[in-house]
Amino acid sequence: MDTPARLNDLQRTTLAIVLAGGRGTRLGPLTNKRVKPAVHFGGKYRIIDFALSNCLNSGIRRIAVVTQYKAHSLLRHLQRGWSFLRGEFGEFIDLWPAQQRVEGAHWYRGTADAVFQNLDIIRSIRPKYVVVLAGDHIYKMDYTRMIADHAESGADCTVGCIEVPRMDAVAFGVMHVDENRRVTGFVEKPADPPAIPGRPDTALASMGIYVFSADYLYSLLEENISSVDTDHDFGKDILPRVVTQGTAIAHPFSMSCVSSDPNVEPYWRDVGTIDAYWAANLDLASTIPTLDLYDRSWPIWTYQEQLPPAKFVRDMKGLQGSGNNLIVCGGCVISGSQISRSVLSSNVKVSSFCNINEAVLLPQVTVGASCRLQKVVIDRGCAIPDGTVIGEDPVSDAERFYRTDDGVVLVTPEALRQMPK
């Protein structure tokens, strides 16, 4: 029975490890300067804020963030915005950058190796359960419910899972489960994903969320590190090993998702491509978004820079700036332009006579006068020249910028510098 005392005990004996060192290559130029979990999202957040907020809201106060690739932006964000836990009470958010801590002097070679190289630190914390999380997904989830499910089942490992369209499952680990939720098969990113029996168009995908009994995890990692034929990866190596030698159960996301509307389908997004990133941002600008950022019972925490309020002003000719289905953050100024279904991050300036639709503008973007922007992601610090048109001519867009097959255009400062004057 999940009494308050038992849930509190589960929270106090759990260590959460957030994996935040991946390159995020599918996001193209957006991750040339920063790791994927540090990418801005939803106007004022970073992607990693969702996993960290889930930890805090779930009552988990012992958290480690594993970093490696281009981590400066991420480390600065965590130091400025996530340093409020009290070490006196045994609470912490520790940063575990790659340090070549083990014999052999190599950097993190995979997700499992990243945890293994910090095994001495983990053992010193003495957790009973270890939650391993990907730091690059957008969702709200009560991890304590999943930990309680793990403890009650007696499994060695519990895997968070969600149903996805079968053809989308090529980007995930895919599971087979029996009627008791026991995982009987696991394959990482298959070219031809297996379907759920009786449902040929749907697959059961891993969410990249694992709960391990700590001692069992230690033995798995020590066994894996001595193996020759391994990628040192949880999805490719550790989970298949658990399925064959131990007990793994599947934990459906619906059992622990957090939603202000129980009738809405559970919201979980992998924003690993420009198209997915753009679409997930615009989801938030809809009239009633599936992901409720205004739920005060499950807040998403982040670093709060001190900025003046956003404002819409008339231009010198008296034209009023306006917008609808629009997220606007602090420090933004919109002068005599029309903006719809878009997300404007902090300190964005839009000059007069612009028409902007379905756009995601990251912080400190400046848009010159008389611009037309459609279906774009504008990277941090871009200065769009007066009269620029993006999103109307696919050929011109592809010549100047990074354009996806679905027509989303990513604009970066580097691309703007290469444009003819």
Swiss-Prot record:
Q: What class of enzyme is it?
A: transferase
For this protein, the record's CDD domains field holds: ADP_Glucose_PP, LbH_G1P_AT_C
Q: Name one GO biological process term.
A: glycogen biosynthetic process
What EC number(s) is this enzyme filed under?
A: 2.7.7.27
Sorted keywords for this record are: ATP-binding, Carbohydrate metabolism, Glycogen biosynthesis, Glycogen metabolism, Nucleotide-binding, Nucleotidyltransferase, Transferase
Q: Which GO terms describe its molecular function?
A: ATP binding; glucose-1-phosphate adenylyltransferase activity
Task: Copy the pathway line from the protein's UniProt record.
Answer: Glycan biosynthesis; glycogen biosynthesis
Catalyses:
alpha-D-glucose 1-phosphate + ATP + H(+) = ADP-alpha-D-glucose + diphosphate
Annotated residues for binding of alpha-D-glucose 1-phosphate: Y108, G173, E188, K189, S206
Subunit comment: Homotetramer.
Q: What does this protein do?
A: Involved in the biosynthesis of ADP-glucose, a building block required for the elongation reactions to produce glycogen. Catalyzes the reaction between ATP and alpha-D-glucose 1-phosphate (G1P) to produce pyrophosphate and ADP-Glc.
Member of which family? Belongs to the bacterial/plant glucose-1-phosphate adenylyltransferase family.
Q: What is this protein called?
A: Glucose-1-phosphate adenylyltransferase
Protein source organism: Paraburkholderia xenovorans (strain LB400)
